[in-house]
Amino acid sequence: MKYQKLENQEANWKWIYLIRKHREGENITRYEERSLQEAKAQELLESQNYPEKIEEWIKNHLSPALPIKLDQAIRARRKRFFNGEKQHTKKKSIDLEYAVWLRLSKYSRKMKMTLSETITYMIDERESKAQFENQMAAMKTSLKNLLK
């Protein structure tokens, strides 16, 4: 396993996920009767700060349609949590206009690079071009002074 499991943290993530699903109107329990669904959801709601109770509730009352979705959500959350700890793995987002993103995407495919690598490459190229222009300007000035 790439990422360490944190039992208490993951129980809290599961609680958040299930309560959000419940508030969106989805049945998170294995029961068909509406009053029983509400009672079990309320029981889960009250067990927020008790990881053992959350895990027990999931084992006993979770809808058969949810375990895979729940596991996927927790796995993704765990990955984001651990990647967010280190600066070099932490993901950042930027807003791009669609046309800009499209051009960048095409250029990335052409260069066989990721978007991040392409942006880094373009910045490096621009910096080296600026450095070259400064050197050329300095040489021109030196030549003019020499020819006077």
Curated annotation (Swiss-Prot):
InterPro entries: Arc_rbn_hlx_hlx, MatP, MatP_C, MatP_N, MatP_N_sf. It comes from the Bacteria. It is found in: Cytoplasm. The keyword Cytoplasm applies. The keyword Disulfide bond does not apply. It holds the Pfam family MatP_C. One of its GO terms (molecular function) is sequence-specific DNA binding. Transmembrane segments: none annotated. Disulfide bonds: none annotated. GO terms for biological process: cell division; regulation of DNA-templated transcription. Keywords: Cell cycle, Cell division, Cytoplasm, DNA-binding. GO terms for cellular component: cytoplasm. Homodimer. Belongs to the MatP family. Required for spatial organization of the terminus region of the chromosome (Ter macrodomain) during the cell cycle. Prevents early segregation of duplicated Ter macrodomains during cell division. Binds specifically to matS, which is a 13 bp signature motif repeated within the Ter macrodomain. This is Macrodomain Ter protein.
